[in-house]
Amino acid sequence: MWIKELELKHYRNYDHLLASFSSGLNVFIGNNAQGKTNFLEAIYFLSLTRSHRTRADKELIHFDHSTVSLTGKIQRISGTVDLEINLSDKGRVTKINALKQAKLSDYIGTMMVVLFAPEDLQLVKGAPSLRRKFIDIDLGQIKPVYLSELSHYNHVLKQRNSYLKSAQQIDAAFLAVLDEQLAGYGARVMEHRIDFINALEKEANTHHQAISNGLESLSLSYQSSVVFDKKTNIYQQFLHQLEKNHQKDFFRKNTSVGPHRDDLAFYINGMNANFASQGQHRSLILSLKMAEVSLMKALTGDNPILLLDDVMSELDNTRQTKLLETVIKENVQTFITTTSLDHLSQLPEGIHIFHVTKGTVQIDSDIH
């Protein structure tokens, strides 16, 4: 899939923008603080209904206005789809082909994106919440039912934690009802995650071995707070541990086990990647991003859109070449932001170059 056209109204520093793109490489050049990242964020937001930079929707609204509108024309294998998101003080409205979508899981996945931004380099050593978010964003696009089950899980988790904080003593019967619901949704969330990580590991290892010229292997491990011996009995094990932890959870006023506390670990040649070099970290993240692209295509039959936000300067020539080889080979529409073309020596011919200045975008008259 690829985005043919994007229109922004009152988005960040863009008062109004209407732009068309190549199905291949699109490079956005400009000085810092001109709107390059805002532009990629808009594509990301149109896809996922959320920003990767802020949780506050009001920060996305142009300072002179009270509403935001984003519309995009997406070319999928199945045909053209129009997406639309409108933000105001009354809330958010999402539409597909002008039809309002009641559920997030009905909208997300229509346009798939993979974002590679400088903050992704913190994925290995950062907080577990970053790695859970990484899983949730990818898996939610590939399998929308996952988002629905995760939403139900979080709703019951909030109820359980609220009860634990307010209760003066344990009501075992009431907790048992919540435990059964939480274990049911939580087990399905974990099953989806485990399947996803197993599939991602195969793709990521293939890319990582290519980047390292066969010198390194990459493995991934889903680290669950729920102890279980096989995937088929997660529900029973989860339920048992919830029941066993009633006193502890009551004392701590929160739920001590479940997918909300799970993590993801990375290993290079069997060694924990926390102890890897900076160069190895870059190779690992690059392998993951290329694996995301490959896996989304393998599981959905359609390519995602790749967003590279000021990361090419973080990669040496070898890693740049490997990334662009994958992009070209897989025919992935790609958006690259940069302050200069100096470190993009490996770019092929036929790219579209756009110049970004103070919230305006101008296509280069000469296609490179």
Swiss-Prot record:
Main location, first listed in the record: cytoplasm
Superkingdom in the source lineage: Bacteria
GO biological process: one example: DNA synthesis involved in DNA repair
GO MF annotation list: ATP binding; single-stranded DNA binding
Keywords: ATP-binding, Cytoplasm, DNA damage, DNA repair, DNA replication, DNA-binding, Nucleotide-binding, SOS response
Covalent S-S links between cysteines: none
Annotated positions binding ATP: 30-37
PROSITE patterns: RECF_1, RECF_2
Database matches in InterPro entries: DNA-binding_RecF (IPR001238), DNA-binding_RecF_CS (IPR018078), P-loop_NTPase (IPR027417), RecF/RecN/SMC_N (IPR003395), RecF_2 (IPR042174)
Pfam families recorded: SMC_N
PANTHER family: DNA REPLICATION AND REPAIR PROTEIN RECF
Function: The RecF protein is involved in DNA metabolism; it is required for DNA replication and normal SOS inducibility. RecF binds preferentially to single-stranded, linear DNA. It also seems to bind ATP.
The protein's name in its UniProt record: DNA replication and repair protein RecF
Organism encoding this protein: Streptococcus pyogenes serotype M5 (strain Manfredo)
Gene field: recF
